[in-house]
């Protein structure tokens, strides 16, 4: 059964379409109007092994906040939809990602109990034209809408680009593990409750 989903969301601030295949090969087409954000989402798709299409048109004449946060919302919703009740998956995933002087770790529980622990610090307020505070907004929106409990922590690192990118890669690799089909579940939700 294909684990794909498409979600469209339109507000007065943004118009977004996201399509994802959880069992893809990491091919992506990303267009948000924010170059560095596109780069991060491309990295997320590649290292997660997800085929991903993102088309976002946002009110960038105001700032990048709505575009970044709302794209996180819709991406999270698409993953939640593609998981179809979280049946048969491994549920848990974790990753350590080094990027030159930076080391970031991420642990995920696809529990349908969304939560974000964010221990990431940036030494500069911007990377490219993007405000670094928006990375937390993305991850929070993504967690709340995907049903994921995410713990993301940069253990050390100086370069702002590396800190941001290692975070997206760590999220991708941890999520890749968590969404994997686990034959031991017999197609059931991996919980003593029987549902997630």
Curated annotation (Swiss-Prot):
Pfam families linked to this entry: IGPD (PF00475)
Transmembrane residue ranges: none
Protein name, per record: Imidazoleglycerol-phosphate dehydratase
Family: Belongs to the imidazoleglycerol-phosphate dehydratase family.
Domain of life: Bacteria
Lineage: Bacteria, Pseudomonadati, Pseudomonadota, Alphaproteobacteria, Caulobacterales
Pathway given in the UniProt record: Amino-acid biosynthesis; L-histidine biosynthesis; L-histidine from 5-phospho-alpha-D-ribose 1-diphosphate: step 6/9
Species this chain originates from: Caulobacter vibrioides (strain NA1000 / CB15N)
A GO term, aspect molecular function: imidazoleglycerol-phosphate dehydratase activity
Keyword annotations from UniProtKB, A to Z: Amino-acid biosynthesis, Cytoplasm, Histidine biosynthesis, Lyase
PANTHER family registered for this protein in UniProt: IMIDAZOLEGLYCEROL-PHOSPHATE DEHYDRATASE (PTHR23133:SF2), IMIDAZOLEGLYCEROL-PHOSPHATE DEHYDRATASE HIS7 (PTHR23133)
E.C. numbers: 4.2.1.19
Gene Ontology annotations of biological process type: L-histidine biosynthetic process
Locations listed in the record: Cytoplasm
PROSITE patterns per the UniProt record, alphabetical: IGP_DEHYDRATASE_1 (PS00954), IGP_DEHYDRATASE_2 (PS00955)
GO CC annotations on file: cytoplasm
Gene field: hisB
């Amino acid at each position: 059964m294909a684990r794909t989903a498409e979600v469209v969301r339109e507000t007065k601030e943004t118009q977004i379409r996201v399509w994802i295949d959880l069992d893809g090969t990491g091919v992506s087409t990303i267009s948000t109007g924010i170059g560095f954000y596109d780069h991060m989402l491309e990295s997320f798709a590649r290292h997660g092994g997800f085929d991903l299409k993102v088309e976002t048109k946002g009110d960038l004449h105001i700032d990048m906040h709505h575009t970044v946060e709302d794209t996180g919302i819709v991406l999270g919703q698409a993953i939640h939809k593609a998981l179809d009740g979280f049946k048969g998956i491994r549920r848990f995933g974790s990753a350590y990602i080094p990027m030159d002087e930076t080391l970031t770790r991420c642990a995920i529980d696809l529990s349908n109990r969304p939560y974000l622990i964010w221990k990431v610090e940036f030494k500069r307020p911007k990377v490219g034209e993007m405000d670094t505070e928006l990375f937390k907004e993305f991850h929070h929106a993504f967690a709340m809408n995907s049903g994921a409990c995410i713990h993301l922590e940069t253990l050390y690192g100086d370069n702002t680009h590396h800190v941001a990118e290692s975070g997206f890669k760590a999220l991708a690799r941890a999520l890749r593990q968590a969404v994997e089909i686990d034959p031991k579940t017999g197609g059931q939700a991996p919980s003593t409750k029987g549902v997630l």
